[in-house]
């Protein structure tokens, strides 16, 4: 029994140790190793195929702020806006001209976004709705010249009057014309002022303009972004170092930007937002470089979440407060003067796009309260206007995300241009967009069957081993306790031998022994001596054993 108790104790202890080591140490390392070998941008892998051409469209929503009192605002009144939308588009993402560098473990490519209007999802909106917005060309040129080239104001004012006859501070046009088809810009005039201004169109400095013939251009917010090159990236493939998967190394063949007033703001941090490395820690955040903003933005962990029954982590981001973060002072017009920094929740895009544009969260969510107070019709709230991503960190899979951004005109009075002379200084919201994705069951099942079933198997196995080992340990302990509580009496071998010898003596020996005992009794009996007055004839003497 003692041998069995020891074996049971050893087996149970070994099972307990194996369950702990395998469940919490070995299995996670094995899983991490397997994922690191599969999740790379090496040619031929599933991840490379999905990354290079997204097999499903993203949802792209556009919400427009229709100005309902344009004449009043032009005369210095408070703007009043009405949100119109969403206009829904299917956005397809693909990468082309891919070039791998095995030595550097990088891949270079051109990014392309293609938009298709989704009539069904946009209904009842058709895209032909008439919208009133700040005039994108008149406002941006007039304000930029006043701030940076005031000496040229007279020439520019004359050119604008020729190119944009009868232009007003606010432009009223159909949604599709404003955003995709374009509004006409006439550069056919032979006037010197007109030719001087139109030079920026012919050289391509106005990125939102598309040349249709020798003298005319079409200007739109997103027309030039549709099915065109969005920039050339160079990113890490993650073969040699999986932690660097997707990290941007170069953009436009440059290792960093050169437009901001500090290295911290010019650095590339994170990926191109279409892929993330597996095994990221919560405190690392999710960083991505955004060419539209000419900067990198990082989402921070907020809380645990779930998607289709699978656990995930929710990350959120906003524009922050540049004034309060010393590392971001390079985004100010003058890093030494905090008064030149943008308001909380905004970012000045003038250096990025060459115009008085301000980026923010939709409806100025999480921004300076003054931004909302200056415009009627805004209603910021977390559910509709927060940027978030539900992320599975082990595999690096984003389950669902909503990337939202609002674009605003940084308006101010322009003395040199009559239509803009009396307007008030205000950050005027124009439109906001949402790029959303939700993985369907086809792709969530891939994660579920390859990752979470393995995790569940590991959890079940380790707890089963621990349970059985604890039962075994308790059983062994009970057996030890039971045996130690009982008393085993063992006679010495010599006594046992003598006892057996006496027990085996023949009958005559026992009779002889009995006779000897009788003789001894008689010898020890009291002598028969007469005592006067005492009759001892009838006295019986009993022999008693002495103990």
From Swiss-Prot:
Family: Belongs to the CD36 family.
Subcellular location: Cell membrane
Superkingdom in the source lineage: Eukaryota
Keyword annotations: Cell membrane, Disulfide bond, Glycoprotein, Membrane, Olfaction, Receptor, Sensory transduction, Transmembrane, Transmembrane helix
Glycosylation sites recorded in the entry for this protein: 66, 213, 226, 440
One example GO MF annotation: scavenger receptor activity
GO cellular component: cytoplasm; plasma membrane
Extracellular compartment segments: 29-460
Lineage, uppermost ranks: Eukaryota, Metazoa, Ecdysozoa, Arthropoda, Hexapoda
TM stretches of this protein: 8-28, 461-481
Major localization class: membrane
Keyword ATP-binding on entry: no
Region spans: Disordered: 506-531
Paired cysteines (S-S): 265-330, 294-352, 332-341
Biased composition (Low complexity): 511-522
Membrane topology: Multi-pass membrane protein
Official protein name in the record: Sensory neuron membrane protein 1
Cytoplasmic-side segments: 1-7, 482-547
Organism the protein comes from: Drosophila grimshawi (Hawaiian fruit fly)
Keyword Cell membrane assigned: yes
